[in-house]
Structures are given as C-alpha cells and as structure tokens.
Amino acid sequence: PLCRAAVAGGKLVCRWHGLAIGAHGVPGWEPLPAHDDGVLAWVRLDSVGGEEALPMPVLPRRPDPEISLDAVYTGIGRCEPEDVVANRLDPWHGSWFHPYSFVGLRVVEEPSEDVDRFVVEVAFRITKRIGVPVRAAFSCPEPRTVVMDILEGEGAGSIVETHAVPLGVDDSDHPRTAVIEATIASSPRPGFAVARRGASLMRPAMRWAAARLWRDDLAYAQRRYELRSSGRWPG
C-alpha cells in the first residue's frame, strides 16, 4: 500500500512497483490536499464532504510537543458521527458507563451563550479507594470533533481530541463511523520526563486505556443510532 511508500526527491515511491508519484500526480493518480499536524495526518476530500473547504483542519490548543506524549486510538462503529459526538457530550456518561475508571463526577458548568462548553469535576480511579481528581472542560471546535481539556489537577494542560469520521455505509446500508482519538498528555512532574523517554512502552498502554473506554462508548453510540434509525428514539 502507498501508505508504506518511501519518499524520495519529493515523490512518493511505491515499494512494490517503483512507481513515483509527484505533487501533480500521474495519469490515473490524483493528489489530494493533505495536512500533517504532528499527531494526526489529514486528507481533504472535497468531492465527498459537500462542505466548504478549509485550508487546514480546525485544531484546538495542544500542549507543547517538546514536553508532551501523544497516542492515537482508532475504532469503527455502526453509527453516524452525531452518535459519537452525543456520547462525548453526555457529561454524566463517564460515571454511568465507566465506573471502573471514573468516580464522583459532578457537572459544575453548563454551556451558555458566552461560553459553549461543559465543565466537570471527576476523579480518575487508580484503585478502588484511590482516585486522582481533575477539572475538565468539553467543547467542540468543529461539528465532528469533541475536545476534553484538563483545566486543573493532575495532567493540567493535557487534552483528548475525539474526531468522528464518516466512512460511508456497510453491506447492509448502515452508516459506519471511525472514532479517531488523540490523547496528548503533559505534566510538570519530574517522572513524566521519564515516561516520555519510554514512549514506545507508554503509547500502547494509552491506546489500551482508550480502547477499553471506547468498547463501552461505541456500544452507546451504536445503540443510539439503532434507536434513532428505527423510530424509537425518545423525543
């Protein structure tokens, strides 16, 4: 696959055929606008989106890459992007669906005309009796992205970006949506610098933690889609 191709002289070189594709493409191959933000790679599909094209993705404030650690999780569900976004914007779902990870959740700020965000206080479980309290804000920089920003507590300044990407429909004509979630962690603690040096070990652990949560959250999103599409969604 071309995703594993080499880059030489500004051209993408297929490792199998030796085909070299430059910035203007070749017959049968058309380049697409792309953007690498340092954590995620984006491709702009103008003919698919049906929306006004932007010069680059809408990104939130991120921690300094020199002192942060990132990991990306990808999952796919039978639902639409709005179901994924609804899951992330349900401020109470953390305690309801993930009691093994969160405890003592309290909504302290709701969206208003001036500030369009939720703010919650919650503790991340370490053991049954020990948790790490934080204050976190949830907001949407664009319609298919939800950002959790740690405002206070352990890891303040860290963020979790959740992007809901439509993938078309499956063989049964049901929509498929990819959840692409980037966790970008930062901490002033001396031990975090050690963790960054062990990034090759930390990233799989961070992806595992995200996958554990999304096992439940995708079930939520898929159930929501099932109720909506069958006319059983309340209201």
Give the ranges of each region predicted by the language model.
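Rieske [2Fe-2S] iron-sulfur-binding domain
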Residues: 1-59
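C-terminal catalytic domain of Rieske-type non-heme iron oxygenases
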Residues: 56-235
